[in-house]
């Protein structure tokens, strides 16, 4: 991984009055570019081949310029071009997937957030340690398939976007479905409602929901639309579907907005606070947007089953603000909140605290 000292040395050569916000043209790029423009930043889209035409349909979110590459890994070879643009890169899920973790960690361009959190987020053992040390409720895990005594969800390592999962109601069904030779995690299947909670942690802002250092925002909540799990049971029972050779899948195709019972908000902020404070102890802390993927049971308890330590696609629902972010600032999106953090850090001479 490129060192923080090397990144700060590169940043020292920037014209800070002319910072460019850059990201890969995918995932949440429309929101990121739109938010950056709202805060007065120049924007730069990184794409493979010709610039995507769909940006022409969304002029308020079309980047001011593009860098066209032959492959995403070519970003490392083109880092000097990005540096010449005074670029700060905003990572998102697609960028990390396309570029690869090792290449992302080595990219010699100032990047918003703490790159060290990626190792903790992407490794299921480390992620679980993080959550357990934070003291939040997590699903029970089975180390041995012989111990399965309830419905479970099985996640292959590296699963993302709803792929790489299956549900088994007992150990016999697990044995019939498991793909040998792949690493996997077995968790109890929690009955409840899924809430994907969008947070933003600022280590430099003082006004708001205070932590030991900085503040925590809760900007929105969504749930995922999954194909074909959200529609499949309209055509028959589980047994009828299995008899016909039809099985549920969980590929994410979209997102729906949600609001919580107001009485649950203290629990939400407690979850976010615990995860942030523990991240500071473990690896120096997350910076910026992150999401806790949770299930709320009928006892109104939260079970946290995953962390995404960057902007998530569910925030795209709220480009013009959410029921929660509107109570912070009218029309505030996560993309704009990122740009605001960079602008604030620049004005304070504290960019080193929010980039890596």
Curated annotation (Swiss-Prot):
Q: In which pathway does it act?
A: Purine metabolism; IMP biosynthesis via de novo pathway; 5-formamido-1-(5-phospho-D-ribosyl)imidazole-4-carboxamide from 5-amino-1-(5-phospho-D-ribosyl)imidazole-4-carboxamide (formate route): step 1/1
Q: Which UniProt keywords apply?
A: ATP-binding, Ligase, Magnesium, Manganese, Metal-binding, Nucleotide-binding, Purine biosynthesis
Q: What is its EC number?
A: 6.3.4.23
Which terms does the record give in the GO molecular function aspect? ATP binding; ligase activity, forming carbon-nitrogen bonds; magnesium ion binding
Role? Catalyzes the ATP- and formate-dependent formylation of 5-aminoimidazole-4-carboxamide-1-beta-d-ribofuranosyl 5'-monophosphate (AICAR) to 5-formaminoimidazole-4-carboxamide-1-beta-d-ribofuranosyl 5'-monophosphate (FAICAR) in the absence of folates.
Extract the HAMAP family matched here.
IMP_biosynth_PurP
| The protein's name | 5-formaminoimidazole-4-carboxamide-1-(beta)-D-ribofuranosyl 5'-monophosphate synthetase
Gene (UniProt) = purP
